[in-house]
Amino acid sequence: MGRFIFVSFGLLVLFLSLSGTGAGLHCPSDWYYYDQHCYRIFNEEMNWEDAEWFCTKQAKGAHLVSIKSAKEADFVAWMVTQNIEESFSHVSIGLRVQNKEKQCSTKWSDGSSVSYDNLLDLYITKCSLLKKETGFRKWFVASCIGKIPFVCKFPPQC
């Protein structure tokens, strides 16, 4: 009986120490887990709007990737480098610059604000991408109609 209580208590302590760390959250196969989100590069070539639509169909809350920190940018760059087909040199991300009523606005496709800025150039009504020549670490703006691979991101559900 004492051993059972000891083991049960140990398991309870382990469970409580892991709660809130992403334990129990799982990404589908072929997706990567990082900082409470799932990520995946798709080597299909789509324009920005089609890629965003495609991402939203992958899972609840999915969008083109939003990048909130330098560490997340490093993770995305690593994941893209590991999984992009050799012939591709760009991938779409969820950042879009729009000019509405002569007011420029920059937002991620998930609706969140830009809190980490890694843009090299800024133009009106453009979409953002990562380039191979920078190790997929710097953001560039480009036409939203170009068809290139893209990265999706979503928060996993319990």
Curated annotation (Swiss-Prot):
Keywords: Disulfide bond, Hemostasis impairing toxin, Platelet aggregation activating toxin, Secreted, Signal, Toxin
Domain spans labelled C-type lectin: 34-158
Tissue specificity note: Expressed by the venom gland.
InterPro entries: C-type_lectin-like, C-type_lectin-like/link_sf, C-type_lectin/snaclec_domain, CTDL_fold
PROSITE patterns: C_TYPE_LECTIN_2
Subcellular location: Secreted
Gene Ontology molecular function, alphabetical: toxin activity
Cysteine disulfide links: C27-C38, C55-C152, C127-C144
Signal sequence, renumbered to the chain: 1-23
Gene Ontology CC terms: extracellular region
Matching Gene3D superfamilies: Mannose-Binding Protein A, subunit A
Domain of life: Eukaryota
PANTHER family on file: MANNOSE, PHOSPHOLIPASE, LECTIN RECEPTOR RELATED
Biological role: Snake venom lectin that activates platelets by binding to the platelet collagen receptor glycoprotein VI (GP6). The indirect activation of integrin alpha-IIb/beta-3 (ITGA2B/ITGB3) also induced by the toxin is upstream the cytoskeletal translocation of GPIb, FcRgamma (FCER1G) and 14-3-3zeta (YWHAZ).
UniProt similarity note: Belongs to the snaclec family.
More info: Negative results: does not act by binding to GPIb.
Annotated protein name in UniProt: Snaclec convulxin subunit alpha
Naturally occurring in which organism (per UniProt): Crotalus durissus terrificus
